[in-house]
Amino acid sequence: MHKHITYYTSLISEYAFIAYFFTFSFFPFSADIFKLLCLLTVIGCWTARMLSEKKILFIKTSLNIPILSFLLCSLMTSFHSVHIQYSLGTIFHDYLTYFILFFCMVNTIQSLEQIKRIVKAMLITCGLVCAYGVYGYYTGVVIRDERLVATFEYHSRIAKYISLLLPIAVCLFFYYKNIVSRLYLSILIFVCSLSLILTMNRTSWVAILVTIFFIGFAAQKKYLIYILIGMCALGIFILPSKFITQVKTITQVNKFFTSEEILGERLLCWKASIAIMKDHPVLGIGPGKKNFRNVYQQYAEKIRNTEKQPKNEAVEQSQGKKVKRKTKIKGIERLSHPHNVFLHLLVGSGIIGLLAFLWLFTAVFYAAIRSWRLSRSEYEKALLMGITAGLVSIFLHSFTDSFWKKPDAVFLWFIIGILFTVIHNTINCKQVDYR
């Protein structure tokens, strides 16, 4: 009886996870009721299994304590927040969703075959989203600021989504030997790569470049690096001039911190965030977009006025009279985060929040690299390498953007959930073999 309940609850959870990922990919900012139903279904399956076996089923992972520590730090900073109610809402509606998703996956998905089906569904979904994005870009149906956005409203979000999943597709391409699977993955990689180019997101371009180099050396597929270099060289001749101009700005290092031409309002945002951090070093201003948006406006306006003051009045001598010319101060955007994940955590949760966050993701990276190096299964090795590369890619984004918000963090914790499910499955297999 217990075996039947375990089997069916695990199967239902698998379908619910696939539906949840699909819905979040195509409707990242809507369909909240359906997303909630998917999550409740998984929680219900987990609960049903515990009731059936009459015991608490909570798998011990290396993330349990870091996650608890991060939540406690976030709660502590929330009670010191500018808007306590909003900060608590961010923790319960956002942070808890990430961690519930993780624990549900680790505790309900039982086999490697289920993992394979979930990963396959994720990659198919990613391919469909990118195909829709390419269609929307060239038809003008879904486009913003001449960039591909697909279902995500902003180019940076779809770029992070692709950067997280594309390395997995590349690594699995080397695992599968049959022509059909390789053909499917080749099409997927092409569509995702084209979509990434059309986002014109420079951080993603650099992140994927570094990631492919990482995969090439880690998998001992150095020819992959030569292929990438060849494709980049070919792109110079076939891509429109606006893409080449965008690429050139990446190399203009001398202008990164002296001009807003390349980084835009990020420079002002980082200066304001550092100023906020200095005034609230230990506990921050509290988690949540609203807290940052309101406080940022005050600090950014003060900094901009201070910087523009010498330029506001240019005095000219004309017929012995002083003529004043005023330069217009550009409006300040109502940003919801500091465009840097480390500043995001420092401003929101202070030093203690950042330390808890670093502990959490150090544990994630350690588990990913260790399991990948020790894995004996070819599929697991390819998948774990792809996940590790995806994590590297998403953290490279963290220097100019933040992934610690929906929907980015949901996709990230989906991947982390798969990582630890693979690790747990491997441990169970070794225990069975030992017996």
Regions inferred by a protein language model and the residue ranges of each:
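Alpha-helical transmembrane segments of multi-pass inner-membrane proteins
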Residues: 20-21, 42, 71-78, 100, ...
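TM-adjacent membrane-interface loops and short helices in multi-pass inner/ER membrane proteins
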Residues: 267-336, 342-345, 349-356
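Membrane-embedded alpha-helical segments of multi-pass membrane proteins
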Residues: 31-51, 91-103, 157-166, 206-213, ...
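Aromatic-anchored transmembrane helix interface
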Residues: 63-70, 84-107, 117, 123-126, ...
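Transmembrane signal-anchor hairpin modules in multi-pass inner-membrane enzymes, especially those
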Residues: 1-76, 82-86, 110-120, 172-183, ...
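Transmembrane alpha-helices of multi-pass inner-membrane enzymes
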Residues: 18, 39-45, 212, 226-230, ...
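A membrane-periplasm/extracellular boundary helix in multi-pass inner-membrane enzymes
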Residues: 131, 139-140, 194, 216-262, ...
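Loop-to-helix entry and N-terminal half of a specific, functionally important transmembrane alpha helix
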Residues: 13-21, 65, 336, 340, ...
